[in-house]
């Protein structure tokens, strides 16, 4: 009986050897969208996906996750190319609305580590899409442009922990909110610096709403402390916003995370 079944066993093995590469090569883009949604708790979604996991496009949507009804879509479509390399994957992302040049990244898996390195880049994103993330963004309803620059940015996951190297700078330009009649309220800079203890710094570039703060990632958690205040002649116009974004302490609003 064993000898009689052997040819069938080889036939099945041969069929699988031919079919599995084809399945991987033509895996639909929906496979990628499902995994991204699961990994982010549903807060980052790719909808209306077309193509394959290797070359495809979709609509990028931010949501509040879970049962939240909040969602906001990035204008235009997000396009990607994923290519295998000898020690990992090469990723190219292009957003028609926001990336003058494609974003390039390299994923490497080695010695129990996963390493994601982002090539130095510049991009510009609409702040309005943040409202899709739910509280507090759905209340703030921010408007403006988010200008992102990265330099030597690299994340390494090992033994359940993440290490960060390089830096990123996010300039929030000409920002406004439905909670204030001021248009704009100001422009701001958020700087991320990697290292043994990654650090975050918030500063005001210009405007009547003054924001400052600093934070660090300690034990994989962000601890941030900052404050918001209004220029003396703009306190009434910014009162509602100051009440929402932090805990009032006189003319200031104290912001804490973690």
Set out the residue ranges of the language-model regions.
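Short, well-ordered strand-loop elements centered on a beta-strand within folded domains, enriched
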Residues: 88-96, 113-121, 159, 163-168, ...
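Extended terminal
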Residues: 1-14, 33-39, 180-258
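Short helix-loop boundary/capping segments
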Residues: 156-198
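N-terminal beta-strand/beta-hairpin edge segment
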Residues: 44-139, 151
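Residue-level recognition of well-ordered beta-strand positions that form the cores
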Residues: 59-61, 81, 94, 147-149, ...
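Extended amphipathic, helix-rich lipid-handling scaffolds
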Residues: 100-102, 107-155, 194-201, 229-258
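N-terminal amphipathic/hydrophobic interface segments
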Residues: 16-61
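Residues that define the transmembrane beta-barrel architecture of outer-membrane proteins
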Residues: 52, 72-74, 142, 184-186, ...
């Amino acid at each position: 009986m064993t000898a009689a079944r052997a040819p069938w066993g080889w036939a099945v093995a041969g069929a699988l050897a031919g079919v599995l590469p084809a399945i991987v090569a033509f895996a639909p883009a929906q496979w990628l969208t499902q995994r991204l949604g699961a990994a982010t708790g549903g807060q980052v979604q790719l909808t209306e996906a077309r193509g394959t996991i290797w070359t495809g496009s979709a609509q990028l949507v931010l949501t509040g996750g879970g049962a939240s009804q909040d969602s906001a879509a990035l204008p235009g479509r997000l396009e990607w190319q994923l290519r295998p390399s000898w020690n990992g994957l090469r990723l190219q992302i292009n957003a028609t609305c926001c990336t003058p040049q494609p974003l390039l990244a390299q994923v490497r898996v080695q010695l129990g580590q996963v390493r994601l390195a982002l090539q130095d880049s510049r991009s510009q994103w609409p702040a309005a899409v943040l409202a899709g993330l739910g509280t507090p963004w759905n209340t703030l309803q921010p408007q403006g442009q988010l200008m992102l620059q990265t330099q030597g940015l690299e994340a390494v996951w090992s033994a359940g922990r993440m290490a960060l190297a390089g830096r990123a700078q996010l300039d929030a330009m000409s920002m406004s909110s439905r909670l204030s009649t001021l248009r704009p309220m100001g422009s701001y800079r958020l700087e991320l610096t990697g290292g043994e203890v990654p650090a975050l710094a918030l500063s005001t570039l210009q405007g009547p709403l003054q924001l400052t703060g600093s934070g660090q990632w300690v034990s994989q958690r962000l601890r941030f402390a900052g404050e918001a205040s209004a220029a003396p002649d703009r306190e009434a116009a910014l009162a509602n916003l100051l009440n929402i974004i932090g805990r009032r302490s006189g003319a200031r609003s104290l912001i804490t995370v973690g």
